[in-house]
């Protein structure tokens, strides 16, 4: 009675703590969390307008498109949307302002290659060619923006200026203005824009905003027959991703519950056993949620979705106890025989998940906290409470039989036949060598996919719209994001100013300016047109510029992506190394025998060789989502290996058959895991689908190695001395 009261009190406390946990949806929590990276990502979103929602109007005539844009704008304002964030024209003011800042601080943005170009630009012939081109560009209709650009940089020293002028004709061919509305050149599409105040990653808040916009879209479409209006942009795609993840998760959870329930009902005739498994895992889940509340207070729902994978690990503990009970006479005997492998497996698995804590990614740390607390809570329930709930009456367990793929092969997996085991060992060695060769040949290829766009889900229509709009938009975009590097470090600013001053050494600025003015006069320009340019040439520059406020960090998108790739790849390598060390050290401490620790560790090492080799051969890569399975597979692999090794040791010491029941519980556990994650192969979201694919490969390799290698390695390495050794 006291134990029931204690359990009720603990559950009540855990439930109250878990209820205080807050949730949010931000997939960037899986990315590095250092301040420099955060600033870079914020800057990237600003420069690339990642929070902008594009409203695409597609109709029969330009006039109907204009009317549709007007009606949409009126309804949007009437519904309470911020009018200042809605526009139907291209906003060039920010672009021009950015250019003016760059031109006013010229040396801070020039690169070594720019100085090589300047050697040919700052000559009488270079002046004449550049100004003749400027005159040609300024004679084009609607060239007002170019006047601002070329008055500050007539020689187009900066690639941004060169791109803006050189792409002007291409932009005219891609877009046109009709009564002040932005349209494609063929006037079949018009565009309006709305800047989300929530950025591109806050999918929960953006979902409400996009629902409001979609309602206005539907109302507008009803007023125009044949009008097609669609939403596009990073916030739209992020919301669609979040919704797709939820739909896929519900599908996977529903299918998993049905299939696992059928499997457990088949294996455990008494519903009481299934309830005990559910109670054990539920207690562990509450422990994980409560620990998240205490440690962080807020968690991504994506973390909890992936955290459901941990159920497959936690279910091992009550499952092993209940399965093994069928082969013993008392609950006490069951605990005596199973407690050691349960605790060893739990400690090594918890240690592997704690390896996630030092990673500089919020979601990874949260997952480590949740998984470690859940597994500890589950094992505590199984050791303290579950034995008192288990029935002393033994009920038969229906065995799960291996499929009849090949009689001798299946029998070999079940039996301890030395001949069959040696044949399987030879197969393992040959395939391991083959996979090793594959990995060596492709050693320079990355096994980590850091391209986040590969994890985005888009409908076919969204993908088509996105590709078309990007193709059109590329004609009008400058390349600030690709070509300029702004650094807040005084040393870098000083170095660039020194480059500028060194380039001018030995050159007569007054003479060069006189040559420039003469060339401008020949082309018919007024003397005061290029005053901003002349001032930038004669100005004295210092490092006392608040450059970090205008460009706080790196604008080089290639460098930013490279940093992401390097950081994530380092995380992957770190996980592999640390998990291996943690598992091996705990195995040594638990078995107190280097030989047994090596026997338990080798199957996991070979499993990873197989996993990486198979993934390399069929073209599957790890990414920021399925990398978490690296820790999970280590945890599951060492659990299975330890149980099989403990069973083999028990048979060696006592002569009593123990492997069959251990293998039976492992097979049942593996089937549950394959069901839990294997159903994700049906998911349409790329990230969740990749979880299913990696799980199918990883679990198959882990179970096969745990099944085959430990008994064989134990038999090979056992001498008379070892037979008498107490473990």
Regions found by a protein language model. Name each.
Residues 274-320, 596-644, 705-709, 715:
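Hydrophobic transmembrane alpha-helices and their membrane-interface caps
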Residues 1-25, 388, 396-450:
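Signature of alpha-helical transmembrane segments and their immediate interfacial
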Residues 247-299, 362, 576-618, 682-683:
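Interfacial segments of transmembrane alpha-helices in multi-pass membrane proteins
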Residues 278, 328-359, 601, 653-684, ...:
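Pore- and gate-forming transmembrane helices of large, multi-pass membrane proteins
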Residues 140-266, 270, 521-584:
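Extracytoplasmic
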Residues 67-182, 186-189, 488-537:
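Alpha-helical transmembrane helix bundles of large polytopic membrane transport and channel proteins
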Residues 294-295, 307-326, 339, 343-358, ...:
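Transmembrane alpha-helices and their membrane-interface boundaries in multi-pass membrane transporters
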Residues 417-522:
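Juxtamembrane segments of multi-pass membrane proteins
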């Amino acid at each position: 009675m006291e134990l029931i009261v204690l359990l009720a009190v603990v559950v009540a406390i855990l439930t109250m703590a878990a209820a205080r946990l807050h949730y949010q949806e931000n997939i960037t929590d899986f990315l590095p969390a250092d301040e420099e990276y955060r600033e870079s990502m914020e800057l990237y979103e600003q420069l690339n307008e990642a929070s902008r929602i594009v409203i695409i109007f597609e109709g029969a005539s330009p006039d109907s498109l204009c009317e549709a844009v007007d009606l949409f704008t009126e309804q949007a304002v009437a519904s309470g949307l911020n009018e200042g964030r809605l526009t139907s024209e291209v906003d060039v003011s920010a672009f021009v302002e950015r250019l003016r800042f760059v031109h006013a601080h010229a040396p801070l943005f020039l690169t070594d290659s720019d100085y090589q170009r300047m050697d040919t630009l700052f000559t009488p012939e270079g002046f004449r060619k550049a100004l003749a081109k400027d005159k040609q560009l300024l004679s084009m209709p609607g060239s007002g923006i170019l006047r601002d650009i070329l008055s500050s940089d007539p020689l187009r020293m900066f690639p941004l200026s060169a791109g803006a002028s050189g792409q002007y004709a291409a932009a005219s061919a891609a877009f046109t203005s009709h009564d002040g509305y932005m349209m494609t050149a063929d006037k079949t599409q018009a565009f309006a824009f709305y800047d989300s105040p929530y950025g591109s990653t806050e999918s929960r808040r953006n979902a409400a905003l996009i629902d409001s916009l979609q309602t206005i879209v539907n109302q507008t479409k009803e007023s125009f027959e044949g009008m097609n209006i669609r939403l596009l942009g990073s916030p739209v795609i992020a919301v669609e991703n979040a919704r797709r993840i939820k739909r896929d998760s519900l599908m996977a959870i529903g299918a998993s519950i049905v299939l696992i329930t059928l499997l457990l009902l088949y294996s455990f005739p008494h519903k009481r056993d299934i309830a005990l498994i559910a109670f054990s895992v539920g207690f562990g889940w509450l422990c994980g949620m409560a620990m998240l509340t205490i440690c962080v207070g807020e968690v991504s729902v994506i973390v909890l979705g992936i955290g459901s994978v941990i159920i497959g690990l936690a279910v091992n503990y009550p499952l092993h106890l209940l399965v093994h009970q069928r082969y013993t006479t008392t609950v006490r005997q069951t605990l005596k025989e199973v407690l050691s492998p349960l605790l060893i497996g739990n400690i090594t698995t918890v240690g592997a998940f704690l390896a996630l804590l030092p990673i500089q990614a919020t979601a990874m740390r949260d997952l480590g906290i949740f998984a470690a607390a859940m597994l500890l809570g589950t094992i505590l329930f199984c050791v303290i409470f579950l034995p008192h709930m288990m029935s002393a009456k033994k009920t038969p367990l229906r065995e799960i039989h291996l499929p009849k793929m090949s009689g001798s092969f299946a029998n070999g997996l079940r039996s301890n036949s030395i001949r069959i085991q040696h044949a399987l060992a030879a197969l393992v060695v040959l395939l391991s060598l083959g996979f090793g060769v594959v990995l060596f040949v492709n050693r320079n290829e990355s096994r980590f996919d850091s391209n986040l766009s590969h994890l985005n889900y888009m409908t076919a229509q969204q993908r088509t719209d996105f590709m078309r709009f990007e193709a059109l938009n590329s004609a009008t975009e400058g390349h600030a994001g690709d070509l300029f590097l702004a650094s807040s470090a005084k040393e870098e600013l000083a170095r660039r100013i020194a480059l500028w001053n060194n380039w001018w050494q030995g050159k007569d600025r007054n003479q060069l300016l006189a040559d420039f003015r003469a060339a401008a006069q020949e082309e018919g320009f007024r003397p005061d047109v290029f005053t901003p340019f002349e001032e930038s040439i004669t100005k004295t520059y210092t490092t006392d510029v608040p450059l970090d406020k205008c460009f706080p960090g790196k604008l080089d998108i290639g460098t930013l992506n490279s940093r992401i790739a390097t950081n994530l790849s380092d995380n992957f390598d770190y996980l592999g190394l640390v998990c291996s060390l943690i598992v091996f050290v705990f195995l040594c401490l638990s078995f107190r025998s280097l030989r047994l620790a090596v026997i338990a560790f080798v199957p996991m090492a070979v499993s990873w060789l197989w996993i990486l080799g198979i993934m390399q051969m069929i073209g599957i890569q790890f990414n920021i989502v399925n990398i978490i399975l690296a820790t999970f597979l280590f945890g599951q692999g060492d659990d299975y290996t330890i149980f099989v090794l403990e069973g083999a040791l028990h048979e060696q010491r006592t002569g009593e058959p123990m492997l069959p029941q251990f293998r039976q519980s492992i097979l049942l556990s593996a089937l549950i895991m394959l069901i839990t994650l294997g159903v994700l192969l049906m998911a349409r979201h790329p990230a969740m689908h990749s979880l299913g694919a990696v799980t199918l490969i990883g679990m198959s390799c882990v179970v096969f190695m745990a099944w085959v290698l430990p008994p064989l390695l134990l038999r090979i390495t056992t001498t008379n001395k070892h037979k008498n050794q107490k473990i």
